[in-house]
């Protein structure tokens, strides 16, 4: 009887790990796209996003059909949603860059690399969650530190963007 609960627990861990793996692969494609601007890479990223969405749908279906979960169902749902947000944003960024014909700047490439590193830490965290929760926490903290670096870098860049916007506005009036 207890073997049934163990198998159900493993389903959730496996699905979260799969979602994090696909997301990490997707963010690596974001970095690669920024290096090459290759449309095939953009298409690969779009496929990864769809794969990640499918894994998330299966996870939600499993959550809805299960009474006992390895940890709080809202936490599982929130973790999955957060991982999904990462690949969604990567895909939408590349899609918009393709449509708007925007070339990545060195700043954008640095941010993408930091995001890739954070996605790797998230991937490592969910890999370790079941058997080594303390190690998983270390990886999660590293991911958070990388997120903070992205936010700090963005905050430093905002005044430059604002100045660029003012110049663009002035030029567009001419």
Name each model feature, range by range.
Residues 1-174:
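Cytosolic, long alpha-helical scaffolding segments
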């Amino acid at each position: 009887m207890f073997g049934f609960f163990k198998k159900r627990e493993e389903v959730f861990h496996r699905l979260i790990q799969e979602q994090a793996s696909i997301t990490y692969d997707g963010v690596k494609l974001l970095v690669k796209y920024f290096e090459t601007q290759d449309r095939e890479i953009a298409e690969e990223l779009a496929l990864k996003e769809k794969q990640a969405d499918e894994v998330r749908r299966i996870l939600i279906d499993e959550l809805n059909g299960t009474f006992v979960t390895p940890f709080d169902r809202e936490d599982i749902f929130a973790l999955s949603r957060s991982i999904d947000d990462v690949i969604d944003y990567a895909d939408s960024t590349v899609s918009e860059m393709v449509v708007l014909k925007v070339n990545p700047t060195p700043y954008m490439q640095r941010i993408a690399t930091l995001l890739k590193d954070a996605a790797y830490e998230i991937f490592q965290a969910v890999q370790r969650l079941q058997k080594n929760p303390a190690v998983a926490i270390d990886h999660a903290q590293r991911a958070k530190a990388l997120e903070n670096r992205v936010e700090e870098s963005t905050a430093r860049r905002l005044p430059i963007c604002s100045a660029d916007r003012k110049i663009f506005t002035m030029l567009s009036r001419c």
